[in-house]
């Protein structure tokens, strides 16, 4: 489909895609990460995680210095060499984490919606929920422009909750395991398009794009990619795109980093 020599950007979700949902292992993807690094092809991480959490993972994966998309697109961490861009080192879209917390606390107190946010608990509790170490769990609480929560109410009340958030200029987004509240103007698609445009401006040529994801909140990202890999995941809703042309979209048989590797194998061999 394309070669390792052509201008290319790879956008990848983390949990359930590049990382195993349970063990956080990424070794099955390691050979491809090395090949892409050697070919100077950026792998841009894109997740609901905080930028602090993602910078830690980015270094672990050998991707430090590259841009990344945090908090479902509400935060863009700029590449190290983009220091001349306004907002360096991070661009934040929409209202802040603190402002969203105020809205949620008001809705919970006055309209009695039932949910638990990451701000309601300590890092030990988050470590139990996620399987992370306490030090890593602490990084998940460093939100800048979103709130992560567990919904503990009915589907009917969720519909009402979403309607109220929309009225207030917010959106409710489902991840692989948790729900996320962020500004309605933010999104993985907008963030990815901004990064693509920046690379195009710097190089004078629009790069081909490949995106990989496994959850409903990855759909906006995959919609704006030239090619997309839908990694088999745990979420019952799955991922559904408007354009699922087999020439553009590949659904993997394997989960997590093995599915990630399968997707790369497919698009680099289908020529």
Swiss-Prot record:
Domain of life: Bacteria
GO molecular function, one term: mannosyl-3-phosphoglycerate phosphatase activity
Pfam families: Hydrolase_3 (PF08282)
GO biological process: mannosylglycerate biosynthetic process
Subcellular location: Cytoplasm
Top EC category: hydrolase
UniProt keyword terms in alphabetical order: Cytoplasm, Hydrolase, Magnesium, Metal-binding
Residues at which Mg(2+) binds: 13, 15, 214
Catalytic activity: 2-O-(alpha-D-mannosyl)-3-phosphoglycerate + H2O = (2R)-2-O-(alpha-D-mannosyl)-glycerate + phosphate
SUPFAM superfamilies the UniProt entry points to: HAD-like
InterPro entries per record: HAD-like_sf, HAD-SF-IIB-MPGP, HAD-SF_hydro_IIB, HAD_sf, MPG_Pase
Entry GO terms, CC: cytosol
Magnesium found in the keyword field: yes
Residues that span the membrane, as ranges: none
Keyword Magnesium: yes
EC number: 3.1.3.70
Residue positions of the active site: 13
Cofactor needs: Mg(2+)
Entry's family note: Belongs to the HAD-like hydrolase superfamily. MPGP family.
NCBIfam families: HAD-SF-IIB, HAD-SF-IIB-MPGP, MPGP_rel, PRK03669.1
PANTHER family per record: HAD SUPERFAMILY HYDROLASE-LIKE, TYPE 3, PHOSPHOSERINE PHOSPHATASE
Name by which UniProt lists this protein: Mannosyl-3-phosphoglycerate phosphatase
């Amino acid at each position: 489909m394309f070669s390792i020599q052509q201008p290319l950007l790879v956008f990848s979700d983390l949990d359930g895609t590049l990382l195993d949902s349970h063990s956080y292992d990424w070794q099955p993807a390691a050979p491809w990460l090395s090949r892409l690094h050697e070919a100077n092809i950026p792998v841009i991480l894109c997740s609901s995680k905080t930028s602090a959490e993602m910078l830690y993972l980015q270094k672990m994966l050998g991707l430090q210095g590259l841009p990344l998309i945090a908090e479902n697109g509400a935060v863009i961490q700029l590449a190290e060499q983009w220091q001349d861009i306004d907002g360096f080192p991070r661009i934040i879209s929409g209202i802040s984490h603190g402002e969203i917390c105020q809205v949620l606390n008001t809705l919970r107190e006055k309209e009695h919606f039932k949910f638990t946010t990451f701000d309601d608990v300590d890092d030990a509790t988050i470590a139990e929920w996620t399987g992370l170490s306490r030090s890593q769990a602490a990084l998940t609480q460093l939100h800048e422009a979103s709130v992560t929560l567990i919904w503990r109410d009915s589907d009917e009340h969720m519909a009402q909750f979403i309607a109220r958030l929309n009225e207030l200029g917010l959106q409710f987004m489902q991840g692989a395991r948790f729900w996320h509240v962020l500004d309605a103007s933010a999104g993985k698609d907008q963030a990815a398009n901004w990064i693509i445009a920046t690379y195009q401006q710097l190089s004078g040529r629009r790069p081909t794009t490949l995106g990989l994801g496994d959850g409903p909140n990855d759909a906006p990202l995959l919609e704006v990619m030239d090619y997309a890999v839908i990694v088999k995941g745990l979420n019952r809703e799955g991922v559904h795109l408007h354009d699922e042309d087999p020439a553009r979209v590949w659904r993997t048989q394997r989960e997590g980093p093995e599915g990630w590797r399968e997707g790369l194998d497919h698009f680099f061999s289908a020529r």
